[in-house]
Amino acid sequence: MKNYGLNEIRKKFLDYFGERGHLVIKSFPLIPQDDKSLLLINAGMAPLKKYFTGEKKLKKDRATSSQRCIRTADIDEVGKTQRHGTFFEMLGNFSFGDYFKREAITWAWDFLTNELEVPKDILWVSVYEEDEEAYNIWVNEVGISPERVVKLGKADNFWELDQGPCGPCSEIHVDRGFEFDPREDAKPGDEGERFLEVWNLVFTQFNKTADGKYERIAHPNIDTGMGLERITMVLENADNIFEIGLVKDIIKTIEEISGVKYKENHKNDVSIRIIADHVRAMTFLIYDGVIPSNEQRGYVLRRLIRRACRHGKLLGINDSFIEKVIDSCIKVYESGYPELKEDRDRIVKIANAEEKKFQETLDLGLNILDSMLKETDSDVFSGENAFKLYDTYGFPIDLTKELVGEVNKTVDEVQFKKLMEEQKERARGSRNESNMGWSSDKKYGEELPETKFDGYNSLKDESKVIEIYGEDENNLKAGQMGIIVLDCTTFYGEGGGQVGDKGIIYNDNFKAEVYDTKKTGKKVFLHYVKVTEGSLHVGDKVTIEVDELNRRDIMKNHSATHLLHQALKDVVGDHVNQAGSYVDGERLRFDITHFEAVSKEQLEKVEQIVNDKIALGIPVKIDEMSLEESQSIGARGLFEDKYQDVVRVVQMGDYSIELCGGTHVKTTSDIQMLKIISESSVAAGVRRIEAITGRAVYKYLKERDRLIDNVKHSLKASNEDEITRRIEMNTEEIKGLKKKLKDITNKDLSSNVDSVINDAVEVNGTKVCTFELSGLDNNSFRDFGENIKSKLEDGVVILANSDESKVSFIALVTDSSVKKGVFAGDIVREVAKVCGGNGGGRKDFAQAGAKDSSKVDEALQKGIETVKSKLNA
């Protein structure tokens, strides 16, 4: 048996099936495209579902791929065992109604025994007990001994879901030898690890109906899967996936960084395996466009990075290290994925940002957790504490569960989830709906026919009222609010981030203001109105007229988002993708996937590019075409959006091509100008850019002129050039005054040091000094505490600094008191609780904040009591 490495095996597999007429498909991204049923691609056939069902077509009816996959169901077992991993590649060959069992079986055998030179005498096969066709091919055509073909039941060798395509499967197993099971009659299907399944051939030949019947399908399919890491284990004679050469190279890097040797200590081995696995997974996740966040696949990535960070800490790695392991990962995968090297800087930047962010709170969070665990004798760790670790220190609940589990405790997840939900409710705030006089829960328009929409071509039209929803059935009167449904409309219904149109609906007897337009899933347009004159009844003819100025402003903003999107990709990086948008007549809001703030310089460059494209007057071309055709010209859509077979493509020259159903300008010069007004964070891994165009920019500039005039007047500057000089003069003057004030304050505080020490409470030889200050800056506050501490041999300093709305606390502990078990973090937490706050820190210094400054005396007394309890006084 030849010792082929993982990258060699992948190439040989794809070449083998490519030579047999298969279309060689590049691995799909880990983010599923147009499939909301999956969080991440977890199997070789997962991205090919629509080709198996016939919804989509490839150039050939047979294909082969090496698909990268992520499975996180057993993430807690990774490292603890040598079998589990989150990242793997799945080799597969597929037939979409082309060849069937004979070819699938004979090619699989030929590839293993001839191409990879796996000895025939270590290979076994299992088949479904009723699949005589497959059994006969294995025995009579391949020539494998009947003793090594095992018939198994549905649980092992029949692939099916509740209903839909299904069929028997045949698995190829490797006999790993008597050391795994000494029994002479051992065979596949037995418990134990002697027989390793390496290749599964699924013969999809039935359709399972809702009533449980199996119907043969006219054109059966083939779906095979062979784990690349598993077959590499076999060829390299490795015991597990962490022993194959490629992963061993990554482990070697971890050994060099940590100074810890693999296979010398079980606890260290667990950490090394976790890092090796998780860094492989995070490298490919980031490459495929995932950004760390607190939701869905972003949370998976965040959890992987943070688990790797924590296990690096357990190995004694105190500095950032993930970048070096990623570099090792990119190097070993370079021949199969050269694009990783090209994208290396972005991958590292995202991982480094998340690692740094977590390291900032990891030590403090671990200390807090340790204190929390010491404070309870219960086997259940409270949900309140778990929530505090999550909310204050960024500990994902899974990490808390893992850490708590290591000391044989469990987390009260019910209470944790309750607190999380309460926080979400607070964030949502009060959402009182306007009292429109009828139920706001009803789904309007569900029973009505689709509304004909002609708003792309005109703003005014004649229409007929087919339904009214309001206080009275079938009619609306002056002063009432309601919803009007028409047989045709020119009003755009809210969708794709664009707000609905405003305007008027009227006839000789009636007039109403349309303040919003929405569209149901069945394309029924709902016109939200306030009646200003007369009355309206179902069946009435009306004139409809969209507010032209508002629509034009919306068009400018929407077209600008397309230019903005591409400019951000050009300047910030191609990983930038749309995460949401909002477009109305006043402004545009554009959310993007990005891991850090977009710099001022980058924003200026983006703004310049967009305005250059506006100045060029690029024609905006809009076409309808098939989804496949749009993809062939490079049209960009949102991964998770579900598109119809015919899509609307908005093209701005060769600069921007996007799928979009919104309203747009005729040429980019219609936008007039774009001004970015803010950039901020809305969630982990998501940045928000707000901008204005057209008339709004003019208003913005007029307001800026007014502000500059006010500043000139306040500074007594004769012109704009003099403003800067005046500010610099005033700043220097303020600095000097602040220094004088600080000198006076410090002198005054220094005179109080001795009196604070003289008033100290002595507890078993330890002096406890407490004092309340007011309105002090942070530096002076801490300096005062350090001055007192420096004059104590064995002591604790607890200080409060309050004003009307809040209070700050610090606790300082001398080395001799720390040795007695008195820790600043413990003290300051108890003190802050009295005033409704929290905090923490090191053993010798800690700080906290609270809102209730009325209980400072009580809080300082609590500090003294806490020290007494620590000293058993």
From Swiss-Prot:
The keyword Metal-binding applies. One of its GO terms (biological process) is alanyl-tRNA aminoacylation. Its cofactor is Zn(2+). Residues 424-443 are annotated as: Disordered. GO terms for molecular function: alanine-tRNA ligase activity; aminoacyl-tRNA deacylase activity; ATP binding; catalytic activity, acting on a protein; transferase activity; tRNA binding; zinc ion binding. Its main location: cytoplasm. Zn(2+) binds at H558, H562, C660, H664. It catalyses: tRNA(Ala) + L-alanine + ATP = L-alanyl-tRNA(Ala) + AMP + diphosphate. Gene3D superfamilies: 2.40.30.130, 3.10.310.40, 3.30.54.20, Bira Bifunctional Protein, Domain 2 (3.30.930.10), Threonyl-trna Synthetase, Chain A, domain 2 (3.30.980.10). It comes from the Bacteria. Its EC number is 6.1.1.7. Binds 1 zinc ion per subunit. Pfam families: DHHA1, tRNA-synt_2c, tRNA_SAD. Keywords: Aminoacyl-tRNA synthetase, ATP-binding, Cytoplasm, Ligase, Metal-binding, Nucleotide-binding, Protein biosynthesis, RNA-binding, tRNA-binding, Zinc. Belongs to the class-II aminoacyl-tRNA synthetase family. Catalyzes the attachment of alanine to tRNA(Ala) in a two-step reaction: alanine is first activated by ATP to form Ala-AMP and then transferred to the acceptor end of tRNA(Ala). Also edits incorrectly charged Ser-tRNA(Ala) and Gly-tRNA(Ala) via its editing domain. NCBIfam families: alaS. This is Alanine--tRNA ligase. It comes from Finegoldia magna (strain ATCC 29328 / DSM 20472 / WAL 2508) (Peptostreptococcus magnus). The lineage of its organism: Bacteria, Bacillati, Bacillota, Tissierellia, Tissierellales.
